[in-house]
A protein has these predicted regions:
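Terminal, non-catalytic domain-edge segments
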Residues: 113, 173-181, 189, 193, ...
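Acidic, glycine-rich loop-and-beta core segments that form the ion-binding/anion-interacting portion
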Residues: 104-166, 170
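Amphipathic, well-ordered alpha-helical segments in soluble domains
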Residues: 11, 27, 31, 51-54, ...
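Long, well-ordered core segments of solenoidal/helical folds
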Residues: 23-43, 74-90, 125-144, 178-201, ...
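Solvent-exposed loop and edge beta-strand segments that line ligand/cofactor-binding
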Residues: 1-5, 40-52, 88-105, 144-165, ...
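Well-ordered alpha-helical scaffold segments within catalytic/enzyme domains
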Residues: 7-21, 56-67, 106-120, 166-180, ...
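Extended ligand-binding groove/face enriched in aromatic
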Residues: 1-99, 105
Length: 300
């Protein structure tokens, strides 16, 4: 998945492309061969973050770069490892969820892309079952995909990991494979929720503002969303950067440091991609150079 071999394969694949370094692509292929039958059979997470769904996305990115059938075969094995019933797409001990990181949206995206690459109809059927399941989780009274990690359903805080950001990104990334009225409604709903989400709070790309901006930038690139989407996006980027810059400069000051939503509990600036400062850099690159820098949240 994202935090295992899949993440390493994806990074090497993208770096090979950006740096014109085929030796890195070869390393990615070597790593892909480690995703064998035993490794796949031992997967109990299944999701994008740690399981088969994330491995599928990373392997397909590598397959697109290499056209290596052995890489595609491993993605297919991962797809066949996923349970037929989306209600059993459970990450570890969690219940089956909506959303991208541990939920149905990420698995649906992986299956749709796998169908597109392999032509195996079963993956399309499985993805459609997943769509029906996730649509059943949408709560119109909450106007969102509820967070089911606790006993009391509550609206998600519009995040990539569990909320509208991830669902919207997943649907947009598969539009060339599956585009119907229901998908368009879901995309429109997700974009509206993200545009209405207030600035502030966490700034990271996984759970916070950077992820929301990444999603809006991707929608703008695809020509989706309302006419004022670009104005909203760039206005939010400008105000966000002012706040982040001020916070980073004063990160040693407790009061100022708390303004920056990238702080660990010990008030140390986090430096990992998903929770820390690199995610801000990644988001800005996606906005500034969309033809060169792919959305990392899609493992695309």
């Amino acid at each position: 998945g994202f935090d295992g071999l899949g993440g390493l394969i994806y990074v090497l694949t993208q770096c090979a492309k950006l740096l014109d370094a085929p030796e890195l692509r070869n390393e990615a292929v070597e790593l892909a061969m480690k995703i064998d039958g035993d490794a796949i059979a031992s997967d109990r997470m299944l999701d994008v973050i740690s399981g088969a769904a994330g491995a599928i996305l990373a392997l397909l990115a590598l397959y697109q770069a290499t056209n290596d059938k052995a890489v595609l075969d491993r993605a297919i094995w991962c797809g066949r490892h996923l349970p037929d019933d989306p209600a059993n797409w459970k990450s570890g001990n969690m219940t089956a969820l909506a959303g991208m990181s541990h939920g149905a949206a990420g698995t649906i995206l992986a299956l749709l892309k796998l169908y597109d690459a392999s032509g195996e109809q079963g993956f399309l059927i499985a993805a459609q079952k997943g769509l029906d399941f996730e649509r059943g989780l949408f709560d119109p009274t909450l106007n969102g995909w509820p967070d089911l990690r606790s006993d009391t359903a509550k609206p998600d805080p519009v995040q990539w990991c569990h909320g509208a950001v991830g669902v919207g990104l997943a649907r947009m990334a598969a539009l060339h494979i599956l585009d119907d009225a229901s998908v368009q409604v879901e995309i429109d709903t997700a974009i509206k929720l993200v545009m209405l989400a207030p600035d502030g709070g966490r700034d990271n790309i996984c759970c916070g503002h950077a992820g929301r901006l990444s999603m809006l930038a991707y929608a703008m690139r695809l020509g989706l969303g309302p006419e004022n989407l670009d104005a909203v996006l760039f206005s939010r980027v400008a105000s966000w950067l002012e706040r982040v810059e001020a916070s980073v400069k004063n990160v040693s000051d407790d009061a100022s440091g708390n303004i920056l939503g990238l702080m660990a509990r010990d008030n140390i600036l986090q430096t990992d991609l998903m929770q820390g400062l690199p995610g801000i850099g990644q988001t800005l690159l996606e906005i500034l150079a969309p033809d060169l820098i792919r959305p990392v949240l899609l493992l695309d």
